[in-house]
């Protein structure tokens, strides 16, 4: 290496001699050009014709031959190139070492942005407010209260429905003509009538609290196979015919007396219908009826509450309906 360093000369230390292309030669060339062409001075800024094919006159005493470099010159250039390459490599190695030392600790230390998102391993986790699973798992009292309220509402709604199912029956019983309208709703009202027989027994003395057996009365007008519907028809006809025919009869007091023995007669025939229902139905119906054979016809729609009563009452129904309606 020492021999190479001694042999190699840098461009800054060297005195370059390019022969005829030296600056001294160029100056002489300019002087010669000026001397040769004093008659045509060059005017800058003005366009003048130039012949690219014209060959400049060769000045005398100048060597313009540029031949290949001698082997000695090539060796010098090679040595200089090698030395430059070695120095550049050393500089590059030093820079890498410096960068490696500086970047080493940086690589070990992760970026703070990643720490903020990974809460399991970060030391900042203790400083964060604890909101997590406890608050979510234990429901707040405010969330429990609306549930209780909703259940209370459901219970109150059911109670209202039960009471409302009983109230319309008393309203309907006030006038015999009202029975014709609910007859169309007989399938919907019949379950209410079936579910509320004990309430009728309790409210029997009132006379108008009985649930909706009068509603099923109408379907008899059209021939229908089900027993419940066939029992109901005789009533609206009789109810509509009786008040129209016997309204002028003023005997309001003896009518309940006539109905009471009829009630005692009809109780054994029902075989399962509570006597209080028949009594309440008779008292609640405001139609005047003096004949005995028509009273059991009006009582029969109250009996379909029990299945046994329906089956037993079907044949007498067919016999009694034509006589009562006509």
Swiss-Prot record:
Residues 132-148, 182-198 have a biased composition (Low complexity). Residues 70-94 form a coiled coil. Keywords: Cell cycle, Cell division, Coiled coil, Cytoplasm, Cytoskeleton, Mitosis, Phosphoprotein, Repeat. Residues 38-304 are annotated as: 6 X 4 AA repeats of P-X-X-P. Phosphorylated during mitosis. GO terms for biological process: cell division; mitotic metaphase chromosome alignment; regulation of mitotic spindle organization. Residues 213-226 have a biased composition (Pro residues). InterPro entries: DDA3/GTSE-1 (IPR026657), GTSE1_N (IPR032768). Residues 112-124 have a biased composition (Basic and acidic residues). It comes from the Eukaryota. Residues 39-67, 92-326 are annotated as: Disordered. It holds the Pfam family GTSE1_N. Its main location: cytoplasm. One of its GO terms (cellular component) is spindle pole. The modification Phosphothreonine is found at residue 145. The modification Phosphoserine is found at residues 22, 47, 65, 70, 122, 140, 186, 190. It is found in: Cytoplasm; Cytoplasm, Cytoskeleton, Spindle; Cytoplasm, Cytoskeleton, Spindle pole. GO terms for molecular function: microtubule binding. PANTHER family: DIFFERENTIAL DISPLAY AND ACTIVATED BY P53 DDA3 /G2 S PHASE EXPRESSED 1, PROLINE_SERINE-RICH COILED-COIL PROTEIN 1. Interacts with APC2. Interacts with KIF2A. Interacts with ANKRD53; recruits ANKRD53 to the spindle during mitosis. Belongs to the PSRC1 family. This is Proline/serine-rich coiled-coil protein 1. It comes from Bos taurus (Bovine). The lineage of its organism: Eukaryota, Metazoa, Chordata, Craniata, Vertebrata.
